Amino acid sequence: MATQAKVSAEDQALLNKFARSYQLQTQLKAECKEMKTLVENINEATDEVLLLDDEDSASIPCRIGSCFVHFNSDSLNEHLEAKKASTETVLAEKTNELETITAEMERIKKVLYGKFGDQINLDAEE
């Protein structure tokens, strides 16, 4: 029978930190995916506005929150570009945070696997 390593308070703190980091990592991945989809949708909307003729581009409905606001094509393009820029900025921040969290999780994994070996499993099943 293999001897089991004792779990110290520091080890438990690392395990807890890893668990919290994993939850945050999962949340950040979902947020990044959502923001990437939003940027793609904005790009598609911008392309569609370019395809409109002069008559149709005079009043284009755009959903903001729970209501629709009518824009002309120039105003809508400005609105879409501003929305895209702000979304890309937030996406870059979230991606940076995700990379930092992932690096910290890898560091914690090395420490815990070094002490406990195959007695623990910290790898996500995907």
From Swiss-Prot:
Quaternary structure and partners: Heterohexamer of two PFD-alpha type and four PFD-beta type subunits.
Record-linked Pfam families: Prefoldin_2
Role summary: Binds specifically to cytosolic chaperonin (c-CPN) and transfers target proteins to it. Binds to nascent polypeptide chain and promotes folding in an environment in which there are many competing pathways for nonnative proteins. Appears to play a non-essential role.
GO MF, any single term: unfolded protein binding
GO cellular component terms, semicolon-separated: cytoplasm; prefoldin complex
One GO term (biological process): protein folding
Protein name: Probable prefoldin subunit 4
Family membership noted in the UniProt record: Belongs to the prefoldin subunit beta family.
